[in-house]
């Protein structure tokens, strides 16, 4: 370039560059020009013994994502779901979590069902200081700065259910569960509590995840004739268990079963008549009578089919996405450190009622419900907490150190 008098060539160059940059910015900001999407990872089992319970959660996440995108996404960035099948295998799910974080560049993870799966994924999430929304009730005795627990803590599900059963059905009880950390730890808490309340444990049996042979367990229940059974089986084993009870003539009116992992989706899969008259405890039932829930159920059925049902883990998955979207939209925070701070200040009106993220535990304040299964596949609510319950992942009547020592002393089972 020929030098102009007074050094004007430099000024001309600066002006030219500035105009070019401004043109690029204006071009990028033109109406209709899409901003880059923002990815989230979804980790659920679409195959294997857990598929019947977990696959519907992907649809709940999808509904929340579609609703968020319809209202502008995250400040103009559309949310993109990247779904990985965990194959009912905790170790494999951890590998997929690593892939989603390091290769796909997702901003948050939504998923896991069993505690074995969550505990396998947890070190991956913590190693990367990432973020997991875990949507299922669980045994407690855990906190992580990198996990938002949208399912129930023990004092929001299994503890009120066990106490209600003891008060209403009798003091003699039997425990059955899948052989991994959730049933073992949940029953550790229950035995400790019910013993203090004068309860009498008649028997306790654990079966491999996915087990179908229930003969020995049902024979023992028939012989012991407990006032109630507390059931922490998971996955397809529940269908085999209730079929075996029915075949043995063990009925809900004489020996009611209280389940922690059977909801509307499982009733539809295993046959509505099998569990009619038995009980379950959750933080959400599709039959909840409030305007927010009725609208939620209608939107879901319009999107995925009138025959579909909703349950607690699905609603908790939906709520998890809603919490993340609201936090991410706040001051355009997709930075994980800042996002986590915003999340601990979130309160949200949801289909289950008002929920709030507890600053100290990263669990949700939420109500507890006990439902009695009906022949139409829904639950009649027979008890509910008066207010949202403060989450206590470590039940208050022992110290965290005592609980962890008791848990570590359990027999070697799946993590």
Question: What is the predicted role of each segment?
Answer:
Residues 2-415:
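Extracytosolic ligand-binding ectodomains
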